[in-house]
A protein has these predicted regions:
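Ligand-binding beta-strand-loop-alpha-helix segment within the catalytic cores
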Residues: 134-178
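Short, charged/polar low-complexity linear motifs in solvent-exposed/disordered segments
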Residues: 32-33, 125, 154-156
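Short, acidic/small-residue loops that bind anionic groups at enzyme active sites
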Residues: 107-142
Length: 179
């Protein structure tokens, strides 16, 4: 599996991202396609004795900051790690894209660049939530402020497919949580 990783996203990037990427290569045997300021990433790896084995780097010159307006940033920062990473995913250069950067920009970028499956109007953020009996998948963790019924149905289908294929659960149950 090849995972495209935003090396510039998150509070302690690129160091924290590099540490995680190197650990993923070592423990899971995945390939990493790291997107970011290549010179800074290489220098950070060297300064901290982090091996770049299994990590291929793609240089880009811009970063979408947390304070940037998401849609404007996606449209104007074409050489940002998020935009470049999402384009690489769209081109089939990796199996997944991971970023600890701007959630809003990632959400907008996924819709505009990668696009959604037929019948899915909006992407949904998802997270595995630990529980006593069995972890569960929580979809649309507050990313969409207003959801129509057909969007909720699409989220249910996406979540069910994910839990079935990734977690190996044959007949996952679906529930609606609301405040």
């Amino acid at each position: 599996m090849k995972i495209i990783v935003d090396m510039m996203g998150g509070d302690n990037a690129p160091l924290a991202v590099l540490e995680g990427a190197a650990q993923a290569v070592k423990e899971y045997g995945v390939q990493i396609l790291g997107v970011g300021n290549e010179e800074l990433v290489r220098r950070t790896a060297a300064d901290n004795n982090i091996p770049l084995d299994g990590i291929e780097l793609v240089n880009c010159t811009q970063v979408i900051e947390m304070c940037d307006e998401p849609a404007r940033a996606i449209r104007s920062k074409k050489d940002s790690s998020i935009v470049v990473g999402l384009n690489l995913l769209k081109e089939g250069k990796g199996d997944a894209f991971v970023s600890a950067g701007s959630t809003g920009a990632l959400h907008v970028g996924a819709s505009l660049i990668v696009r959604t499956l037929r019948g899915v109007k909006r992407p949904a953020l998802a997270t595995m939530v630990p529980a006593k009996k069995q972890a569960y998948l929580l979809l649309d963790c507050g990313a969409n402020v207003e959801c129509r019924p057909e969007m909720l149905a699409a989220f249910a289908v996406m979540g069910s497919c994910y839990v079935n294929k990734v977690e190996g659960r044959k007949d996952p149950s679906v529930a609606l949580a609301n405040n």
